[in-house]
């Protein structure tokens, strides 16, 4: 199936454990993380998600199924205060949406706040900047990429890895985030660390997570598609039979990720 778009902008369980690397960019942890309540929550009862919180660490454990219906359980750890700071990096003060005097100084200050909050401004619209969020959260997703390679092997194909990780994020319970978290506007998006602390996420948040994992391999050419209030993904390459694909700048981008993650 070819799609043309105008673009804007039970079985045994295999256990694998990964200790995540630390991020060299964070030395002054800040704040606590507010517990959020999702709307329209849905969960596959066969999957399992847990997080153990100590003074120093978050210990994550996720059970999910593969495309071949084999069950896996991944576990990994991350420093708690560092993770909190990574979460608190995303989000913008609600005052940025209030009227202001457009002096040169105010405009520069406003633009700086938008950028450092991992948001972007396009015309009169201020929204999360996925292009900056994806590389920013790669430090958190590095253990997930390492677990993918350990699970599938270094000889696995790019498509096999994408399909496997797609099932991983699909088995994360679905829930729509609120517009605010930790006294900041988050526009209904959870950062990758917060997805696992909350143990749920919506479509856009899961696309962000998946993109941040795959970003560890430069060979993945990923295009994010904003369509009907959803964020979808497409990959550059030769489509398989029955794959949905689009034509973008003369290149085939195949295998769109559905909006019902």
Please report, for each region that a protein language model flagged, where it lies by residue.
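Bacterial N-terminal signal peptides that target proteins for export
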Residues: 1-8
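A structural boundary/capping signal
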Residues: 6, 21-261
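Hydrophobic h-region of N-terminal signal peptides that target proteins for export
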Residues: 12-20
């Amino acid at each position: 199936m070819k799609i043309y778009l105008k673009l804007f902008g039970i079985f045994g369980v295999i256990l694998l454990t990964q200790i995540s690397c630390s991020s060299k960019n964070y030395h002054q942890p800040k704040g606590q993380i507010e517990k959020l309540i999702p709307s329209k929550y849905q969960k596959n009862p066969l999957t399992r998600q847990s997080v153990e919180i100590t003074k120093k660490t978050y210990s994550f454990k996720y059970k999910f199924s593969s495309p071949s219906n084999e069950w896996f359980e991944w576990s990994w750890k991350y420093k708690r205060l560092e993770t909190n700071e990574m979460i608190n990096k995303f989000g913008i003060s609600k005052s940025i949406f209030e009227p202001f005097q457009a002096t040169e100084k105010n405009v520069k200050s406003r633009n700086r706040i938008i950028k450092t909050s991992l948001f972007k401004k396009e015309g009169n619209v201020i929204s999360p900047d996925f292009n900056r969020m994806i590389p920013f959260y790669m430090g958190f997703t590095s253990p997930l990429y390492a677990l993918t390679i350990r699970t599938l092997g270094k000889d696995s194909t790019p498509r096999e890895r994408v399909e496997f990780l797609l099932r991983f994020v699909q088995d994360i319970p679905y829930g729509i985030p609120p517009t605010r978290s930790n006294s900041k506007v988050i526009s209904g998006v959870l950062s990758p660390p917060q997805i696992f602390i909350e143990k749920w996420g919506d479509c856009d948040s899961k696309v962000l997570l998946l993109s941040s994992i795959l970003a560890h391999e430069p060979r993945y050419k990923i295009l994010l598609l904003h369509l009907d209030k959803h964020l979808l993904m497409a990959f550059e390459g030769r489509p398989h039979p029955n794959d949905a694909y689009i034509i973008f700048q003369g290149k085939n981008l195949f295998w769109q990720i559905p909006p019902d993650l």
